[in-house]
Amino acid sequence: MRRDFAKKLYDAMEKDTRIFLITADLGYGVLDDIRRDFPKRAINIGSSEMLMVGIAVGLAQSGYIPLCYSITPFLLYRPFELIRNYMNYEKANVKLVGSGRDDDYAHDGISHWAGDDMHVMSTLKNIKLYKPRDITDKVFTDFMYNDKPSYINLSR
């Protein structure tokens, strides 16, 4: 599912220069083509998830379409204050992409579990949620181009 998403994201970034990818030291292999071909719009900020979401909020407020990509629990729980305040209340149009669902990364310990992401995110009523079985063109297009802050969860 991640590879399908990355291919669709690559195609979208070719056509739309407003799209930025910000990753927190994740996506090696899957996102390498994007990093290579769009170096000014593909940013790896290291393991600094609050910074990642903060940068994305600034880009969204400047008219860009920022996409944050990381392992689901790190993407959501570390920067939750910014997600709640800026995405949910201020409606900054940031796109969150969580890699891994349920126990996809359980072998790395409880900090990597992602079984409650949809429950937690459902408390933020202004963020559109997606948990697709596969990445169709319709799902991808709706996720990227709806005018609401959004979260999508991708299985490994």
Predicted region positions:
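Thiamine diphosphate
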Residues: 1-156
